[in-house]
Swiss-Prot record:
Protein purpose: Involved in the binding of tRNA to the ribosomes.
Family: Belongs to the universal ribosomal protein uS10 family.
GO biological process entries: translation
Any one GO cellular component localisation term in the record: ribosome
Provenance organism: Xanthomonas euvesicatoria pv. vesicatoria (strain 85-10)
Gene encoding the protein: rpsJ
Organism phylogeny: Bacteria, Pseudomonadati, Pseudomonadota, Gammaproteobacteria, Lysobacterales
Name recorded for this polypeptide: Small ribosomal subunit protein uS10
Keyword Ribonucleoprotein: yes
Length: 111
């Protein structure tokens, strides 16, 4: 670990970003991560909800005329951020073994 000028060790932090289309799935996965990290003695901040990205698509229903006949679709991408402060080896091992749902995208950054 890097040392600061005061002689203390710098705080190590794991930042986990979750993305999913289903908000129930992402909340369940976030609670599993929080529970696992707390069980191993690490301190957790979050889950912090980030703004939901909404993409809307408008499609003409008619193959020829009728500009008024349209369908509208949207996809919502929900995001959460978790910070795990001062993780130990048990925390990292438990997070690596954790099985999350297939619809959740996980990005892990160590700082």
């Amino acid at each position: 670990m890097a040392e600061q000028k005061t002689g203390q060790k710098a705080d190590q932090k794991i930042r986990i970003r979750l993305k999913a289309f289903d908000h129930r799935l992402i909340d369940r996965s976030a609670s599993e991560i929080v529970e696992t990290a707390k069980r191993t003695g690490a301190q957790v901040r979050g889950p912090i909800p980030l703004p939901t990205k909404i993409e809307r698509y408008t499609i003409l229903v008619s193959p020829h005329a009728d500009k008024d006949a349209r369908d509208q679709y949207e996809t919502r991408t929900h995001k959460r951020v978790l910070d795990i402060i001062d993780p130990n080896d048990k925390t990292v091992d438990a997070l690596m073994k954790l099985e999350l749902a297939a619809g959740v995208d996980v990005q892990i950054k160590l700082t």
